[in-house]
Amino acid sequence: MKTQNVLLSFGIVFLMISFSSETYIRDFITRRPPFGNIGKRSLKDVESLDFLFDPTFTAADLAVLENALEDY
């Protein structure tokens, strides 16, 4: 009974890790080594985050933004 609980717990944690790290079953089965992609986030759409960095912000802009968000 103890072994079954340990195996069940390990299986649940293993599934939670594999699905939370955005690895898909097809990729999980076809990649070599089979456990090499656990824990890695999906980096396919990293270029879509380029809009987060705006080099036109100055220190004055950031100070105004900080003052505006001070009460939150």
Curated annotation (Swiss-Prot):
<comment type="similarity">
    <text>Belongs to the non-disulfide-bridged peptide (NDBP) superfamily. Short antimicrobial peptide (group 4) family.</text>
</comment>
<keyword id="KW-0027">Amidation</keyword>
<dbReference type="GO" id="GO:0050688">
    <property type="term" value="P:regulation of defense response to virus"/>
</dbReference>
<feature type="modified residue" description="Isoleucine amide">
    <location>
        <position position="38"/>
    </location>
</feature>
<keyword id="KW-0930">Antiviral protein</keyword>
<feature type="propeptide">
    <location>
        <begin position="42"/>
        <end position="72"/>
    </location>
</feature>
<comment type="function">
    <text>Antimicrobial peptide.</text>
</comment>
<keyword id="KW-0732">Signal</keyword>
<keyword id="KW-0929">Antimicrobial</keyword>
<feature type="signal peptide">
    <location>
        <begin position="1"/>
        <end position="23"/>
    </location>
</feature>
<dbReference type="GO" id="GO:0005576">
    <property type="term" value="C:extracellular region"/>
</dbReference>
<protein>
    <recommendedName>
        <fullName>Peptide Ctri9194</fullName>
    </recommendedName>
</protein>
<keyword id="KW-0964">Secreted</keyword>
